[in-house]
Amino acid sequence: MSFNFKWPTFSDEFHTSAAQMLNSALNRGPKPKVIADDILVEELGMGTIPPELEILEIGDLGTDRFRGIFRLTYAGDAHLVLKTKVQANPLSKPNRPDIGLFPSSNASRGILFAAAPLIVPMHLRLSSVKLRAIVVLVVSKAKGITLVFKNDPLESVEVSSTFDSVAVIQKYLQQEIEGQLREMFREDLPGIIHRLSQKWLSGEAKSEKDKVKQKAEAEEPPARSREPTLTRSTSEPLVALETASAPGGTPRKSHSKAKKHSRSGASVADFAASPCQSPQRPRQSPRRPRHVAKAASTSAVPLHSEFSATHASPFDAAFPDIENYDPTYGLRPDDLPTHSGFSGLGRLAQRGLGGLKDLTASPVFDLDTALGAADVDLDGAAVFEDLNRQSDDEGSEAEQSQDAHSSSHDGKHDEGDATTDSDLDAVLHDVGDDVSDLDVQERDNLVDTSIDYSRFGYPPASAAFSDAHELTRASSIIFDDQPQLTRKHSKRGSVSGRSSTRARRPSSSRSDRSACTSSLRKREEAEVVYETIPAVGGGIVTRPRVYHIASKVQPPEVDWDDEDTARPSQYGGTPSTRTGTTRFGSDYGSATMGAQSSRTNTVRGIHDLPHLNSAFVSRDGSEESLIDLPPESYHSSDASLPHALDAERSSVSGSDSRRGLTNPTSRESSYRDLSSQDLHWDHSASSTAPSSSQSLHWDMHSRNDAAARTVNVKAGQNAESNSGLSFRKNKSANHQRSITLGGGGGGGFPLRRPGEGPGMSATPARTRASAAASARSRPGFITYATSPPGDSSGWQRSPPLRASSDRDVAFSTSPGVAQDMLSISPFRDSSLHHGSPRETSNVAGAYASASNSPYTSGHNKGTQGAGAAPTHLSIDASAHFLDLVKSNHTLSPFTRSMEHFTVRSAPVTPGWQTASGNVSVVGSSAASGTGTTSGSSQTGANAKSGKAGSDKTRSQDHLSVGHTVAEPKTHCQADSAAPSSGLPARRRRTFQLGGSSSRDDTASNKPNNTSTGQGEDSQDNSAAPGSDDYGFARYAGSGPQPFRASGSSASSAITDSSSKGNRLGSKDLRRRSRPGSMGPPSEAARLSALRWEAIRE
């Protein structure tokens, strides 16, 4: 198809209008300084040569519309002449400010330039425009012509100007104008054509359209005028509340009056109830998000007036908002957001938004105004004024507090339900608490408490911020110093401050509520902290800060009633795993946890019972204890005990002294745990070895035994007095936990290193490695039983995971020790003392001194490497980690800094066991009580190679513990061997928490080493830094050192040398590898990481 287009000369009128449009367009916006005048169109000629159009496609053709795609080619004689004035500035800038007063140097040389700005007229002519474009042309009788260029149409244009004689300027102008023309064709011309066409083509249609539009506009204003109120009311819970809730307005007024008068919670409650009752308010939730409220109250004042007007006859116009529905409703930026629905109303009543309070506060507004005020309050400013102005805050605050309480306490945030009991309750509360409420409210205003993150799964249960009861329970277990209180409060408001996010507002102390509130309050504090993390996909995530490792993360309390449902996996794996992780003080629980470095089998002695929890909690200062403890410390109580002993040694020794001090405490704490628990340790450490270690129940028959052990340790006696701890053997035969602490003569267990003290031997694992490990190897890591039940050597200290040091102790999983160190509180001793005889502490001291011994020192170093290097990751943290693993929280390093998770590189996965042993487990395990595990794995390896020798050595070690200095090597060696020989590599449910990575490697190495050279000197050298490699020292938390493992594959990576130097190197590596963590991940860590990767996939 072809067409002939007529291209007649355009009329003067067209040229004039086009010139005017061009003028306005050219002069719109700021002009460059160079242009000193307006740009005027002097000539505009459309030319006589028409463009060539080639029809490529016709998409729509009708009497009143056309859509086609054309190829437009134009090479005509159209031209455009513009004139303006430009400012020619001096080409040379004077060097001196006084240049104007004196002849310039240039002038003196006879060169004259403008010394001042010069305004020069300028003409610019554009002609010879060549266009080649693909054009989409849409002609509509109603909408005019739309012309769009699908490519860059401008091929060339000729630009001539006044300054053509200056080549530079000419070239510059050419480039600039071409660029601007291209932009014009792309952006401006289509708009110009469209507007022109609307004037010409759609004259009639436009007039009709205008009429319609005017008509619509005429109708709209009333709707709109009314809309702000109604629309707002619909979108604004406040208005809705007003109309729906207080159709007559009187009820509300009466309410507000009542509130004014009595401010009684009842009136507030009544008010809240009233809104709830209103048909329209079914959705209203007491907790309307504050941000929503704010949005709603954007025009608070207008709202007030509108409200009053509307309120006067809310139903006069039936539902004007509906009848005069504005389709743009919700799109108008000035309107309140509609998404809140009516939830804001309930929230208003419930929240300390000052809404109801405002009603009371500002009698003038009455209900309407109060609603408006509430809206404003939602905005926040009005609320604050009102709150400050009136103690009305009390009412709304009460609601808010109640709201918070109900949400946190009930763990439910039913929007409709919010106004009910909890509202009333809150109101009642609030009446009493208005001061605290007010404060809370202000705080709330600052922080949008109204938003309950818990309903979004935030913070994660692992974050200990969740509102869920279960989470709260766990959190209370973890964080709660007052477990009972927490439990009392549906665990939701855990004293630990894990109470629901909403619990932020302090509520008056009321029996239930006060506990809840206190926990809430704690939470509040915790909640105040929000952190912004880069999201993996980009952007950022802002969420309440979740404290991990060194934070208040403590082992979630196991619901003793449902031990298996206590999230054992969280703790490490075996069902019994969780048992130990009770809320006992961090010490005990931690120790328990720690003992099983994996949370696997935490000591679950009698004291694991909830009632014990509180005791332990008090002992630990539960909130701090786990937090304070390093991972190892959490891992095992028994570890803790040795840790405490080692710690005592440590405390004696200078370098270890800090750790040691802490350690003694820790150990003592462990001991204390033992004794306080009557040393009923279901030590996970032991149990760690057996997956059902839970059953491992060290029945330390008496604190006396513990004391005796302590005494023994103090004495440094070799005596393996039965601490009266009989270890009920774990379910796994592996653990010869049945051997009483004092009892097992056969395995190295009975052999208690002198000074080991019953406490040391008290722990089976500890017995096996306990004395040795605790005194000499990583004190904290002594784990019970890595060896099979029958294998006394297995019971001997597990490979000296942490043989090396007090530091080990310090970082040992032993809750006390590690905790001390972490807590930085001088010692957990005091808490340790809670349960156990002071002697324990003394024992710890003795051990600490032993630790100080050279061998200890070496161990300490090793320990430190592993212990110090390890981040303080508590079992709790490990549990958290598991929680995170299982939760939808990404563990990606982008989301959470790894520095907080020692376990990050070596995820704590249950069942870490490699041929080399529980390498991964060992490090952490050893350090954590997983040491037991490491013992286990070592035991496995060692058992394979030199079980008997190991046992012997271990026994020797135990004896030598007393002589820590004297027989560190032997001890370590024995330790290592004992576990190795004692027990086939047993699947330890220990998690390698960063601290023990090196230890892990060592552990695995050690088992192998033990196999190959059970008595390897390096192991023996447990006392010596080098020997630590093989001794507990390797597990001691010495830095991730390359361990010399005889054959441990995991160890081999780090196995390079057992010398302290290696250990240190390993430590350094580990540190390097995970900065916040322990150091380069141990082999175990690596394995763990691989496993983690697999899990992720």
Swiss-Prot record:
Composition skew (Basic residues), residue ranges: 252-263, 284-293
One GO CC term, this protein: ERMES complex
Biased composition (Basic and acidic residues): 205-229, 406-416
GO molecular function: lipid binding
Ranges where the record places region Disordered: 204-305, 317-343, 390-427, 480-520, 556-600, 645-675, 716-817, 923-1097
Domain SMP-LTD: residue ranges: 1-198
Domain of life: Eukaryota
Biased composition (Low complexity): 274-283, 508-519, 572-586, 759-779, 923-943, 1045-1059
Biased composition (Polar residues): 662-675, 784-796, 1004-1024
Swiss-Prot/TrEMBL keywords: Lipid transport, Lipid-binding, Membrane, Mitochondrion, Mitochondrion outer membrane, Transmembrane, Transmembrane beta strand, Transport
Biological process annotations from GO: mitochondrial genome maintenance; mitochondrion organization; mitochondrion-endoplasmic reticulum membrane tethering; phospholipid transport
Membrane-topology descriptor: Multi-pass membrane protein
Compartments reported by the entry: Mitochondrion outer membrane
Entries under InterPro entries matching the protein: Mdm34 (IPR027536), SMP_LBD (IPR031468)
Subunit structure: Component of the ER-mitochondria encounter structure (ERMES) or MDM complex, composed of MMM1, MDM10, MDM12 and MDM34.
Entry note about domains: Lacks alpha-helical transmembrane segments, suggesting that it resides in the membrane via beta-sheet conformations similar to those predicted for other outer membrane proteins and porin. The SMP-LTD domain is a barrel-like domain that can bind various types of glycerophospholipids in its interior and mediate their transfer between two adjacent bilayers.
Family recorded in the similarity comment: Belongs to the MDM34 family.
Its biological purpose: Component of the ERMES/MDM complex, which serves as a molecular tether to connect the endoplasmic reticulum (ER) and mitochondria. Components of this complex are involved in the control of mitochondrial shape and protein biogenesis, and function in nonvesicular lipid trafficking between the ER and mitochondria. MDM34 is required for the interaction of the ER-resident membrane protein MMM1 and the outer mitochondrial membrane-resident beta-barrel protein MDM10.
Name the UniProt record assigns to this protein: Mitochondrial distribution and morphology protein 34
Provenance organism: Mycosarcoma maydis
Gene coding for it: MDM34
